[in-house]
Amino acid sequence: MKAGAIRQALILIALALVPALGQAIYFRNQVSWRSRVSASEIVSVDQARSWGDNAMWVDARPAEEFEHDHIPGAILLNEDSWNELLSQFLGQWSPDKRVVVYCSAQSCNAAAEVARRLREEAQLKDNEGKNCVFVLEGGWEEWVKTR
């Protein structure tokens, strides 16, 4: 009796490991604990504030959170409304501006994704052809702490 139960348990474990192993192999280049943003693309609240009028703030949070509160002067540009909001953003942006994208917290990936799309799809660069899109370290939570 015990041998049959152990055998069934081992079969169930093996069956559960097959899809997990397949997913690990398929997504091996997308390790979840690896940061999606390089250190050179992250900016602290203090650094972004020091840019003054040369910084353009982009809120990547859902519209409801933006409407409730946001960084003064920030514009909404998120994944949910990307196609509708991108033209508004591009109308306000110029190559002499540094773009600071933020979302709710450090663990939120929305800012990283919006920043990536601005770099790759909208091909934003500064006047010298360098990166001008940054992700705010700590996101909205960090901004609120340092108000």
Predicted regions and their residues:
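A short helix-to-beta-strand connector/capping loop
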Residues: D53, P72, E128-C132
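Mid-length scaffold segments of soluble, non-membrane domains
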Residues: M56, A60-N78, Q92-C103
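Catalytic cysteine-centered active loop of the rhodanese-like fold, especially the PTP/DSP P-loop
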Residues: Q88-E141
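Flexible, polar/low-complexity N-terminal or interdomain linker segments that lie immediately upstream
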Residues: M1-H68
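Signature tryptophan residues that serve as conserved aromatic anchors
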Residues: W33, W140-W143
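Active-site neighborhoods of enzymes that stabilize oxyanions during catalysis
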Residues: T146-R147
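Short amphipathic alpha-helix with an adjacent loop that forms part of the alpha/beta core around
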Residues: Q47-W51, E84-P95
